Amino acid sequence: MELSTQMNVFEELLVPTKQETTDNNINNLSFNGGFDHHHHQFFPNGYNIDYLCFNNEEEDENTLLYPSSFMDLISQPPPLLLHQPPPLQPLSPPLSSSATAGATFDYPFLEALQEIIDSSSSSPPLILQNGQEENFNNPMSYPSPLMESDQSKSFSVGYCGGETNKKKSKKLEGQPSKNLMAERRRRKRLNDRLSMLRSIVPKISKMDRTSILGDAIDYMKELLDKINKLQDEEQELGNSNNSHHSKLFGDLKDLNANEPLVRNSPKFEIDRRDEDTRVDICCSPKPGLLLSTVNTLETLGLEIEQCVISCFSDFSLQASCSEGAEQRDFITSEDIKQALFRNAGYGGSCL
């Protein structure tokens, strides 16, 4: 690397020295672009004010034919020396006899360059392997140091900044995981149920979860105790009611057993008038008694015109009938009475 940098400096300083512009370059070096004794600085010919401000035809041609050393450094990579460099030509160009006779010149700048080159030539040759010699012969395979430094800088900056930006953007733009969302939903349901339980339980000592659950358990125990007490009271009331109902049903049975004694005695009355006959019956109820009574009256020649019937406790019938004059002679009121008495299920004769 030291050898390549020294050769680059050497080429940059020696490019303007050509055969066609030898005299002009020497004059510019001694008077315009040489060593400044006042400021002790080197001003190369390419940075001269006259050279930059005033465009001469000869200088334009020279710049086109011989580009600057900085452009050469960027456009083409410097070749690496596999062996010792060849001996250098003398730096000072041959001067005419007239020029040397007229004045003497001192070149401390050129002497310093000669010392640098001599020190670089004394360095040992570079030892390479077989595969590396081919790569060294190809100048495009080894870019210049400036290009390498630029590429390394750009690569490192892009790598660090790009990856960090991507990671940050992924963290910012990414959605939460499914497990996190499920855990949030579970906690929300749990909090909602706790709030409902807190609203139901009348006595809450504290607002934390453990106290809410403890108070709810105590309240449930109190409710269960109340339910058990109410069930016991209901059983006691049921037993007392059953005894009371049994007493009532026993009294009703006794009443039903004594019912025939309480009923009135049967009554059958027949009242005849001019053309109408009135019939009044009161006896114990019997299935089909009404139908049999109506049929008996029709067989006796009595036609029912009006009738009032009651079956509330006893069977009672009050009817007004009409009969013909011929039947009055054949059937008496006593015959009608005895026929209705037998129809009611009584035996014997009605008094």
UniProtKB/Swiss-Prot annotation:
Gene Ontology CC: nucleus
Tissue: Broadly expressed.
Domain (bHLH): residue spans on this chain: 174-223
Record's keyword terms, sorted: Developmental protein, DNA-binding, Nucleus, Transcription, Transcription regulation
Gene3D superfamilies: Helix-loop-helix DNA-binding domain (4.10.280.10)
Cell compartments where the protein resides: Nucleus
GO biological process, alphabetically ordered: gibberellin catabolic process; regulation of gibberellin biosynthetic process
Chief place of localization: nucleus
GO molecular function: DNA binding; DNA-binding transcription factor activity; protein dimerization activity
Subunit-level organization: Homodimer. Interacts with FAMA.
Function per UniProt: Transcription factor. May be involved in the differentiation of stomatal guard cells.
Protein name: Transcription factor bHLH93
Organism: Arabidopsis thaliana
Gene that encodes the chain: BHLH93
